[in-house]
UniProtKB/Swiss-Prot annotation:
Domain of life per record: Bacteria
InterPro entries linked: DNA_methylase_N6_adenine_CS, Mtase_sm_N, rRNA_ssu_MeTfrase_C, RsmC/RlmG, SAM-dependent_MTases_sf, Small_mtfrase_dom
Designated name of the protein: Ribosomal RNA small subunit methyltransferase C
Lineage: Bacteria, Pseudomonadati, Pseudomonadota, Gammaproteobacteria, Aeromonadales
Catalytic activity: guanosine(1207) in 16S rRNA + S-adenosyl-L-methionine = N(2)-methylguanosine(1207) in 16S rRNA + S-adenosyl-L-homocysteine + H(+)
Naturally occurring in which organism (per UniProt): Aeromonas hydrophila subsp. hydrophila (strain ATCC 7966 / DSM 30187 / BCRC 13018 / CCUG 14551 / JCM 1027 / KCTC 2358 / NCIMB 9240 / NCTC 8049)
Gene transcribed to yield this protein: rsmC
Enzyme Commission number(s) of this protein: 2.1.1.172
Length: 342
């Protein structure tokens, strides 16, 4: 059964004639079943997503037409691109730089998104690739822009898109590499700083949930030689960033995609996280609540969960429901660090 489609997709439904018969590549902030409709209109459809949760929700319906990864390569083979505007402008630039080499000369460029989400910067985003785009539609506080690939494009070079900075967490210095739009892409956030300052020496096995650029897991791996570190995230750009952060610091760890605990087997001595609570432009608690509630099932006996969260988020009642003991081990006006034991 299909789910309700977003306001952006409702606007696109009004303009479906634009996609008929196209060899269409779709990417960006995908969040609903609308690509299934596109599959019935186009000559061929390829959906590229960096969101493992979305990939899992659509893979059965779309099959080989949907791809999950941090990059897409190959020869030019598409005559149209539909980019659904991501929250981060830098991520939109990354996707355009990656996808335009896969387009034939003269291919059509479509950008769609919510007005409050940066879509009205389409002129500047598309300027490197062609003339000024036309606004095709504006509805439900969303806009659709239409341009043409009329300028030559450079081959996509993944390495040039990694940001790099030095991170200091207590006595531990780390080099961080991160792709656009990834959490902790440009600096160590204050919440993660508080979390890392609250953690003791550790051994055994550790799960870094929602790893972002890999800062938390990498700092703990560097502080605790012999600690077996596993990092998971739903974002393919975060996963590749974490792999690079581990590698550049000479650290070992396992990194893979998991939708909460979907791909996690075995149990850990510790789970540590600065859990995400935003999805796109919307605050999103459900995945984090599932993460907290199911954590005891993935902890060894005497295992523990340590998280940092914005002080206004009501996570303590959830933790107290599912763990034998929960305490706040550090806090200030903005953040709280919770330690929960099974």
């Amino acid at each position: 059964m299909s789910s309700p489609i977003s306001a952006v997709s409702q606007m696109l439904e009004r303009n479906q004639a634009l996609f008929v018969g196209k060899r269409l590549l779709v990417c960006g902030a995908l969040e609903d079943d609308y690509p299934r409709q596109l599959a019935t209109l186009t000559h061929s459809l390829t959906v590229f997503t960096t969101d493992y949760c979305y990939y899992r929700s659509q893979q059965a319906a779309l099959g080989d037409a949907i791809l999950f990864d941090h990059q897409l390569g190959g020869a030019p083979r598409f005559d149209a691109l539909l980019l659904l505007m991501p929250k981060a402008k830098a991520e939109a630039q990354y996707l355009l730089a990656m996808m335009t080499p896969l387009l034939e000369a003269g291919a059509e460029l479509f950008l769609a998104g919510e007005n409050r989400g940066g879509i009205n910067g389409a002129d500047k985003l598309l300027a490197p690739y062609g003339d000024k785009p036309v606004k095709r539609d504006s509805a439900r506080r969303c806009s659709l822009y239409h341009g043409e690939l009329s300028k030559p494009v450079e081959p996509f070079e993944l390495d040039s898109w990694f940001g790099r900075y030095q991170c200091q967490a207590g006595d531990t210095e780390l080099t961080v590499l991160a792709l656009p739009g990834v959490f902790s892409a440009s600096e160590l956030d204050l919440g993660s700083q508080m979390l890392l300052a609250s953690l003791p020496a550790m051994q055994g096995s550790l799960l870094d949930f929602g790893c972002g650029a890999g800062v938390i897991g990498s700092v703990l791996a560097k502080r605790n030689p012999g600690l077996k570190v596993t990092m998971v995230d739903i974002n393919a750009l975060a996963l590749e960033s974490s792999r690079r952060t581990l590698a550049i610091n000479g650290l070992q760890g396992e990194v893979w995609a998991s939708d909460v605990y979907s791909d996690i087997q075995g149990k850990f001595g510790r789970i540590v996280s600065n859990p995400p609570f935003h999805a796109g432009l919307k605050t999103f608690y459900a995945a984090t609540e599932t993460f907290l509630a199911k954590a005891p099932d993935h902890l060894q006996s005497q295992g523990s969960l340590t998280i940092v969260a914005n002080a206004f988020l009501r996570y303590q009642p959830i933790l107290e429901t599912h763990f034998k003991r929960t305490e706040v081990i550090s806090s200030d006006a903005k953040f709280k660090v919770y330690l929960s034991k099974v």
